[in-house]
């Protein structure tokens, strides 16, 4: 399981608890910058501050198979990502970073694995949607746009 752009880890915690990830033997890899330049759209998010990384890590302290990694995707993925992925959630709101994550991780997604693209259908992220749609089309995949504005791909 992988999430790129985990922010505070809320959705990852819900998935981890629902699946009882500790009992499955699976790992969960969470990535985020955890800090953003002043004036950007992300600086308006609640709880964004200098302790976000440590707070997010603490949220998963009881789950040793969950790794919270700080850095820029896709660079942080090198040597710090799983070989096989059953579930990939991408939520970085940045087209180049999301395409970089797909380039680095898509081949590791198992057949039948799920890829969720957050904000795929949200009108504020058309550049992201267009880039992802073209990327998947070039590989023979269609993105299903869900009513929640997420995109779903089953490999």
Functional labels for PLM-detected ranges:
Residues 1-155:
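S-adenosylmethionine/decaboxylated-SAM
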């Amino acid at each position: 399981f992988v999430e790129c752009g985990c922010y505070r880890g809320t959705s990852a915690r819900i998935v981890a608890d629902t699946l009882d990830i500790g009992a499955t033997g699976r790992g969960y890899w969470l990535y985020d910058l955890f800090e953003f330049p002043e004036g950007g759209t992300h600086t308006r998010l609640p709880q964004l501050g200098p302790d976000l990384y440590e707070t997010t890590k603490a949220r998963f302290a009881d789950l040793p198979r969950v790794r919270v990694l700080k850095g820029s995707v896709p660079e942080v993925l090198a040597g710090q990502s799983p070989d096989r992925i059953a579930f990939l959630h991408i939520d970085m709101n940045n087209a180049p970073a999301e395409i970089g994550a797909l380039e680095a991780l898509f081949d590791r997604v198992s057949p039948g694995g799920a890829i969720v693209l957050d904000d795929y259908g949200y009108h504020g992220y058309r550049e992201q949607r267009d880039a992802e749609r073209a990327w998947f089309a070039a590989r023979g995949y269609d993105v299903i746009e869900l009513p929640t504005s997420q995109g779903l791909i089953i490999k």
